[in-house]
């Protein structure tokens, strides 16, 4: 484990929203360990770090417990029993505990650059959700990262270009940052830009929409359902590219048996003007907060 904790206190800076960072995970403890290490290096620490756990076992519980020694009480483990792929429900459990003004969502296999939280704070604007982006890392370099043999967050620009030439990363300009805000405001309903591995919405907007639709189970399109309801509410997107980029560790593709039905359901909700999830935050029982096995 990295034994340093960087960043400024989580108190609200003038003009910047407080952030609750929600990290979704399921039985990938080594990846989660590296993600939490990247959280500890943030220049602007989030108010909260909430692990939205879809039923992981004891190894993940141990990872969270170890990092809580470094991150303190800001780190919360929001766990639910393993009853199949229920990402929407896992995220809703974390949203329920969130107190930050802005909620940033990432996957538990996405490394955060040191200015990630700060960049989301800077891009955030009322009336907009932020669509972040990702750089994909290859299988071999991912194995090295999870084993602690290298860390792409420490690479120089030259080393990054060499990694791209070798096929270890899929974007040569993955480290590039571009200033400005106006060009980030997207028009229309560009829902394909909104990816669950890196996105941000205002907490009060998510609550207005009743969170994620838990009727969408199995892999895929829970983020599409959310953003289409956001558009129906009158919301727009901002492009977080070249500011809020995450580094996405390699993994095998999940089973996509439910993808077709999930896409149909999400598109139907969008086309009929839905803004509120039928089964979401409001349907969570207040006392339904299961503890992880042997965890905190």
Regions found by a protein language model. Give the residues of each.
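Acidic donor-binding segment of Leloir-type glycosyltransferases
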Residues: 36-84
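N-proximal low-complexity "stem/linker" segments adjacent to membrane-targeting elements
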Residues: 1-41
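Glycine-rich, basic loop-to-helix element that forms the pyrophosphate-binding segment
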Residues: 81-98, 115
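Cell-envelope/extracellular polymer assembly enzymes that use nucleotide-activated donors
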Residues: 17-20, 48, 225
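The conserved acidic donor/metal-binding loop of glycosyltransferases
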Residues: 107-111
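A short, conserved alpha-helix in the catalytic core of glycosyltransferases
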Residues: 193-210, 217-235, 241-242
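Short aromatic/hydrophobic "clamp" motif used to bind/position activated sugar donors
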Residues: 103
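Conserved donor NDP-sugar-binding/catalytic core segment of glycosyltransferases
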Residues: 115-164
């Amino acid at each position: 484990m990295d034994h340093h904790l960087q960043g400024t206190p989580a108190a609200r800076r003038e003009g910047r929203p407080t952030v609750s960072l929600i990290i979704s995970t399921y039985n990938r403890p080594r990846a989660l360990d590296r993600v939490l290490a990247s959280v500890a290096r943030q220049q602007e620490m989030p108010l909260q770090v909430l692990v939205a756990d879809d039923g992981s076992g004891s190894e993940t519980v141990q990872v969270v417990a170890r990092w809580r020694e470094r991150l303190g009480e800001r780190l919360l483990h929001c766990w639910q029993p393993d009853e199949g792929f229920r990402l929407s429900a896992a995220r809703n459990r974390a949203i329920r505990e969130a107190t930050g003004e802005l909620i940033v969502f990432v996957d538990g296999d996405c490394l955060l650059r040191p200015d990630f939280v700060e960049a989301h704070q800077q891009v955030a604007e009322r009336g907009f959700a932020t669509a972040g982006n990702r750089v994909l890392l290859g299988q071999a370099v991912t194995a090295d990262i999870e084993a602690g043999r290298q860390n792409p967050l420490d690479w120089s620009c030259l080393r990054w270009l060499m990694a791209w030439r070798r096929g270890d990363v899929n974007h040569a300009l993955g480290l590039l940052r571009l200033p400005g805000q106006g060009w980030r405001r997207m028009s229309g309903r560009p829902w394909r830009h909104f990816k669950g591995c890196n996105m941000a919405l205002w907490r009060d907007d998510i609550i207005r929409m009743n969170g994620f639709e838990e009727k969408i189970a199995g892999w895929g399109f829970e983020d599409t359902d959310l953003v289409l309801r956001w558009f129906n509410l009158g919301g727009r997107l901002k492009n977080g590219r070249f500011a809020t980029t995450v580094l996405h560790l390699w993994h095998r593709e999940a089973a996509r048996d439910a993808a077709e039905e999930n896409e149909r359901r999400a598109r139907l909700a969008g086309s009929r003007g839905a803004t509120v999830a039928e089964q979401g935050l409001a349907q969570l029982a207040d006392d339904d907060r299961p503890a992880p096995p042997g965890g905190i």
